[in-house]
Amino acid sequence: MQIRQSVKFKKPLIHYITNPISINDCANMILAVGAKPIMAEHPLEVSEITSISESLGINLGNITDNKMKSMLISGKTSYEKKIPQVIDLVGVGCSKLRLDYAKKFISECHPNVIKGNMSEIKAIYGIKSSAKGIDVGECDIITEQNFDENIEMIKRLSMETDSVVAATGVVDIISNGTYTYIISNGCEMLSMITGTGSMLTGIIASYISSGNILEGTALAIAIMGICGELSQNVKGTGSFRNELIDNMFSISDDIIIKKIRINSY
């Protein structure tokens, strides 16, 4: 839990270029874990903003020409200055524009973390996926039957890109090619409100700011799942959203240790 307490103590500045659909919730979630968000996206200022930040988050949801330009500028600045960065592959399974752009970004900016659902991870690896818009396709969901082959693919992608790869879903797989974590926390309601994946990327950006990339990514994913579990006994999805942010703000180390379901592979 040292990573979590370090973020609360240091309050790192997190530059997150994300989509307008969830930008407010993303900023609030970064605040909830103790970091400070800045959501700048103008091409003429993003390099300067990234330079003074401790971490960078890149989200491919709802992209535009200007935002694509800004993301590449920030990504290159982050790489040059050794600032940790995470890219969220939103929609690369259903959009050639996003897929081609994501490949270019990974090649030129070398993000520390590549995050996506299994459809998005398969697409970036070069395997045909069955993505349903930005959601994971039914055929791509991790099952007992395809578990081992998906882990091997994730490990290979990690080694090829020199990035931690985080495949999120009912079961989360996080790997740096050598060490792999399997996380089984979460609940169905996390997929029933928009933006929870984008919020998670903001938390990952916050937790990797210390430079502990694999553990920071795994911790962020586990805590998001636990907070989902703690928040689900509510009237509906609107209440769930608010409860999720509240639990992220107030959750204790003791509850995390008690509820975390994580295994190494």
From Swiss-Prot:
Keywords per UniProt: ATP-binding, Kinase, Magnesium, Metal-binding, Nucleotide-binding, Thiamine biosynthesis, Transferase
InterPro entries reported in the protein's UniProt record: Hyethyz_kinase, Ribokinase-like
Disulphide-bonded residues: none
Catalytic activity: 5-(2-hydroxyethyl)-4-methylthiazole + ATP = 4-methyl-5-(2-phosphooxyethyl)-thiazole + ADP + H(+)
Residues at which substrate binds: 39, 195
Pfam families: HK
Required cofactor(s): Mg(2+)
Pathway annotation: Cofactor biosynthesis; thiamine diphosphate biosynthesis; 4-methyl-5-(2-phosphoethyl)-thiazole from 5-(2-hydroxyethyl)-4-methylthiazole: step 1/1
Gene Ontology molecular function: any one: hydroxyethylthiazole kinase activity
Binding residues for ATP: 115, 168
GO biological process, one term: thiamine diphosphate biosynthetic process
EC number: 2.7.1.50
Top-tier EC class: transferase
Gene3D superfamilies for this protein: 3.40.1190.20
Similarity comment text for this entry: Belongs to the Thz kinase family.
Main function: Catalyzes the phosphorylation of the hydroxyl group of 4-methyl-5-beta-hydroxyethylthiazole (THZ).
NCBIfam families, sorted: PRK09355.1 (NF006830)
Name of the molecule in the record: Hydroxyethylthiazole kinase 1
Gene this chain is encoded by: thiM1
